């Protein structure tokens, strides 16, 4: 009887740990989610650029999903014109550095090519209180006079 109870408790603990791990994975967007959001952002910009940028800045229209959001910059001067990271709105994307001090903004700027989705990798902490740096990947493309991107946190299994 005691053995059966212990087996049930162990099974319950395994399920709880598994559920917690699954919940954490679901709280972050995947590479496929990020690429799909970028593709939707491209369609929105082509349809109505000013409305799209407004939606991106406000996180409306499905353009804020967990830790995923589009950000866009002017090709002419590199200025960020849409982002959920309000501290970089209006700054030059080319000056961005990751938390290790590595400049990655110029890579993002240079990667913005019409009809191509490129990737740039850098180190950034996930949203929340944990300051641990993890690999973040941004998918980037060009839409008219804008460079647009969506970044996701790579799995750290």
What are these regions (language model features)?
Residues 2, 6-157:
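N-terminal membrane-sensor/transducer module of prokaryotic signaling receptors
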